[in-house]
Every structure is written in C-alpha cells, then in structure tokens.
Amino acid sequence: MSSQPRGSGTQPGPSQSPISQRNFRYEPARSGYTSPGQYSTYSTSTADRVGCLTAVRMSAFAKLSRFTRRLVHIRQMDFEFALWQMLYLLIQPSKVYKNFIYRKRTKDQFARDDPAFLVLLALSLLFSSIFYAYALGLEKIGFFTFFLWSVFVDCIGVGVVIATVLWWVSNRFLRKVRDQDVEWGYCFDVHLNAFFPMLILLHVIVPILYPTLIDSPAFLSILLGNTFWFLAACYYVYITFLGYTALPILHKTQYFLYPISFIFMFFVATLTGGWNISRTALNFYHSRAEPHKFAPQHGGL
C-alpha cells in the first residue's frame, strides 16, 4: 500500500502560491466620498428603508422638491448664514466654497438645500431696481417690468443656460473620477454666487453714478463706466473659477480663467472706439421696461 507524504495535499507548490492566484483588476480613481457603511441607498422621496450606517443619495427631483417646499417656509430658512455668504462673496469668496465641501460630506450634495440665498438675492434685485428706476425715470409699471426682467431673465434665465453649459462641460471633459459627478444644482449655485458681486457693481454703483459721472461722451466717463463692467465680468469669471476649483472631482479648472483675456481685449477695444457700454445698456434696459416709449411713431402728414 502506497502512502502519500503527510501534508502533500495541503502545501501549495510554486505555481499554486496564494499570491499568484489573486485576481488583480484595475480600479478607477474615486473621489473618496463614501458612506459610513461603504454603500448608499438611492432615494427618490423618503429615507424609511435606510439603516443607521447607510447614506441617502436623493435624486435630483427629490432635491428640487425639498428645495421648493422650504421656499414657502420662511422659518426654515437660515437668512443669517445667507447674509454671511453674501458678505464673504465680496471680500473673500474662496471661504464660501469651503461650506459647500462640508455640505457634501454631511448631506451628500454640493448644492444648497436652503433657498434663503436665492430669496435674499431676489430682494437685492428688488431694491437695486429702485436705483435704475430713478436713473431711467421709470414709471411704476416700468419699475415692476424692469424688476421681473432682472429676476427671471437676467438672473435665473441666463443662469440656467450658463449652469447647463458648464455642467455638461465639467462632467464631459473635466471630471477625473467615475463615482461622482458635478451636480447641476451646484453649477447654478456657482452662478448665483458670481452674480451677486456683479449685481452690486452694475445694479447699485453704476445707476447711482450714471446721471452725474457716466452719462457723458467724455473719455473719463467712458473709462469709469466701462471699468465697472470690466470688473463685474472679471469677478464673475473668477468666482466661477473658484467654485469649480473647490470640487475635488475636477481637474484642469484653470480653463475657467481664460475668458478674462478676451474680456480685457474687449475692454480696451471699447475704450479705443469710444463706446460707452453703460449708455447702451441703460438704453436697452429702458426700452425693455417701457417699450411703448421706444415704439416707432406712424403719423400722417
């Protein structure tokens, strides 16, 4: 009877090494944002099926519904924090985006879930419209028309277009991880952040100075008025750059600064050509708010 050496069936040979039997596979780069339980539940409404170690990832529709519900509950809005954000957008905008990163780690979203900032921005547009109504000599109906255009077209409408374009560009070309993408709501928040300093420059300072210092064909008047438009555009681009640079899932965000070069060349061209941008803009605003005053008159001889 032949006997087999003890342990001969259990000792692996050179080709049977546990290390050589491991299956190695390529793992794509990840963002590092994981739930405590290393998995998440994708929810479209409530979190009744979620355990204590599971993070909830709400759908875009669920986030929008929650945002809309809070829009009609004034007591749930944190206006004090929204005012703090507005202040630091003027003096230290990079500090504002640190809160967006904290929100991602605690609520699994970069975008704001509190509509207080949007409400205060609309109120700012309401009060700034008073300055334009005075500078343009608008009537009551013209004032409200100007305000509605400013909110729903200049702020929200243009913001939706810009946010959609940058959302697509960021996810298509600038994303360096696969397990996270840029939220459209965050892109719209970046637009609102960049829009507020522009509002202060163009909707407060320009209409105040326009009747006395800007509304003139003199070079200094053109230089002063066009400088405000140049600064507003550069500030918008810079805060937009900061917003996308704050996302750890993106790279090559320096591309967002490239428009500043074209803005500067356009600024120099307007000064060389003697084009008063403020005059053109205010005439356009006036014709939009009170179109009946700019309608062509058809009268017989």
Swiss-Prot record:
<feature type="region of interest" description="Disordered">
    <location>
        <begin position="1"/>
        <end position="22"/>
    </location>
</feature>
<feature type="transmembrane region" description="Helical">
    <location>
        <begin position="194"/>
        <end position="214"/>
    </location>
</feature>
<comment type="similarity">
    <text>Belongs to the unc-50 family.</text>
</comment>
<keyword id="KW-1133">Transmembrane helix</keyword>
<dbReference type="Pfam" id="PF05216">
    <property type="entry name" value="UNC-50"/>
</dbReference>
<feature type="transmembrane region" description="Helical">
    <location>
        <begin position="255"/>
        <end position="275"/>
    </location>
</feature>
<feature type="topological domain" description="Lumenal">
    <location>
        <begin position="276"/>
        <end position="301"/>
    </location>
</feature>
<dbReference type="GO" id="GO:0000139">
    <property type="term" value="C:Golgi membrane"/>
</dbReference>
<feature type="topological domain" description="Cytoplasmic">
    <location>
        <begin position="1"/>
        <end position="115"/>
    </location>
</feature>
<feature type="transmembrane region" description="Helical">
    <location>
        <begin position="222"/>
        <end position="242"/>
    </location>
</feature>
<dbReference type="GO" id="GO:0006937">
    <property type="term" value="P:regulation of muscle contraction"/>
</dbReference>
<keyword id="KW-0812">Transmembrane</keyword>
<feature type="topological domain" description="Lumenal">
    <location>
        <begin position="137"/>
        <end position="142"/>
    </location>
</feature>
<feature type="topological domain" description="Cytoplasmic">
    <location>
        <begin position="243"/>
        <end position="254"/>
    </location>
</feature>
<protein>
    <recommendedName>
        <fullName>Protein unc-50</fullName>
    </recommendedName>
</protein>
<feature type="topological domain" description="Cytoplasmic">
    <location>
        <begin position="164"/>
        <end position="193"/>
    </location>
</feature>
<keyword id="KW-0472">Membrane</keyword>
<feature type="topological domain" description="Lumenal">
    <location>
        <begin position="215"/>
        <end position="221"/>
    </location>
</feature>
<feature type="transmembrane region" description="Helical">
    <location>
        <begin position="116"/>
        <end position="136"/>
    </location>
</feature>
<feature type="transmembrane region" description="Helical">
    <location>
        <begin position="143"/>
        <end position="163"/>
    </location>
</feature>
<comment type="function">
    <text>Required for cell surface expression of acetylcholine receptors in body-wall muscles.</text>
</comment>
<keyword id="KW-0333">Golgi apparatus</keyword>
<dbReference type="InterPro" id="IPR007881">
    <property type="entry name" value="UNC-50"/>
</dbReference>
<dbReference type="GO" id="GO:0097120">
    <property type="term" value="P:receptor localization to synapse"/>
</dbReference>
